[in-house]
């Protein structure tokens, strides 16, 4: 599906598509307006992907938190199955960080990430793809976690080993193709916190080197951290799930920054 294939069209005689907001491997997201001028994000999946659409709808309708982007409705279009999402103004966290907002503001966004994940974990759900590209930051520094493509019940058993997620943020158990629980989201959040503090990921290099880093290499120490901050970061990034915080809510309770 081309990224501009729906631009300029009116769908279901209601939603006027203006432009694509982003395109991933699984779907294309467009900016659309209803007849009253209200903006929405319209996520269109390839034809035949109803099951994937329905799964994301199932996850989204169980969530209700200001730091999670609402899933409003599922639509059946001629172009393919779709989801109507709330429009989240702002930009991806990576672009936002490139403008050097400062550590204090970045940590404020990180805390909102923990709040969003804590809500998911309380509902028995795991995001599975926590990364800056899935965190939208508005001009007021309000953040929303988006994209529940890979989300689902905690420790959901897959029919076959499946590595889900994005390489720099994969927990060791995800590298091994194991079913991830909330601790996998905690690990990914730890990678983001390390990136905020250091300006780079803890493990860099060729894909094989990054995978090995997640599995076996110690986290490179960061100078200037106090004992509480250092211990907190190490626990987020522990190799074994049982050595991490059990959920984002638990990590939030002792957030030292």
Residue ranges, per PLM feature:
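AlphaC helix of the eukaryotic protein kinase fold
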Residues: 49-62
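Activation-segment/catalytic-loop signature of the eukaryotic protein kinase fold
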Residues: 74
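Conserved short submotifs of the Hanks-type protein kinase catalytic core
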Residues: 78-92, 96
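Activation segment signature within eukaryotic-like protein kinase domains
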Residues: 109-110
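Protein kinase catalytic-loop region centered on the HRD/HxD motif
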Residues: 115-125
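Conserved catalytic-loop aspartate of Hanks-type protein kinases
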Residues: 185
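Conserved C-terminal C-lobe helix
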Residues: 225-238
């Amino acid at each position: 599906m081309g990224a501009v294939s729906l631009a300029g069209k009116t769908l279901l005689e209601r939603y006027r598509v203006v432009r694509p907001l982003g395109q991933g491997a699984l779907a294309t997201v467009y900016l659309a307006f209803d007849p009253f001028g209200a903006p929405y994000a319209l996520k269109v999946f390839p034809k035949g992907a109803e099951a994937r659409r329905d799964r994301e709808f199932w996850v989204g309708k169980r969530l209700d938190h200001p730091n999670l982007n609402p899933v409003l409705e599922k639509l059946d279009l001629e172009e393919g199955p779709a989801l109507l999402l709330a429009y989240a103004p702002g930009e991806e966290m990576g672009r936002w960080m490139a403008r050097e907002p400062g550590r204090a503001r970045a940590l404020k966004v990180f805390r909102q990430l923990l709040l969003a994940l804590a809500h998911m974990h309380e509902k028995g759900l795991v995001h599975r793809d926590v990364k800056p590209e899935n965190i939208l930051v508005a001009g007021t520094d309000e953040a929303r976690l988006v994209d529940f493509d890979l989300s689902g019940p905690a420790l959901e058993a897959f029919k076959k080993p499946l590595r889900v997620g994005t390489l720099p943020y994969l927990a060791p158990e995800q590298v091994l193709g194991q079913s991830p629980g909330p601790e996998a989201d905690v690990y990914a959040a730890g990678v983001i916190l390390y990136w905020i503090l250091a300006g780079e990921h803890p493990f860099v290099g060729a894909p094989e080197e990054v995978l090995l880093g997640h599995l076996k290499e110690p986290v490179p120490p960061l100078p200037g951290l106090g004992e509480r901050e250092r211990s907190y970061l190490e626990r987020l990034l522990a190799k074994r799930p049982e050595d991490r915080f059990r959920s984002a809510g638990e990590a939030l309770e002792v957030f030292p920054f």
